[in-house]
Amino acid sequence: MLMPGVLLAGEKFDGSWLTTLTCPEKGKTEGYTWKFPGVIKDGVYHGERGTAGQPGYLSIDGKIADDGSAKLSANGIVASRQYARGVFVGQGTDYSYNIKAQFKETEGKGTRDEGLGLVGRPCTFDFVKQPASSQAGGR
């Protein structure tokens, strides 16, 4: 039995998070920054940007360990050739990569697995926990 007010380790991260993905330019590939919402529930992160099945869509999922470490999986659809690296990559092409992240109670940081040196680039992730809604609980 848990004491009132005591959170399980995974629950300390639960809540709404603002996710910022930043990919710098590399060679002729333009850089970009995306901001999108994410949610951690029962120690599992899920974030989405865009419309599923459409160019520019990105979905990120993964379990956060009790110490805040996480290996997240990203799956998406290329928005535009100008932002994608690779010889055979164009708008509408599916892609995926892993993210190594570290969460604290109100913030987190992550880095994209760069993949092949010629094709990949060092994208970073910033996670910021959002305040609980003022409508939650009593007003």
Locate predicted features:
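Central antiparallel beta-sheet cores of small beta-barrel/beta-sandwich binding domains
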Residues: 11-139
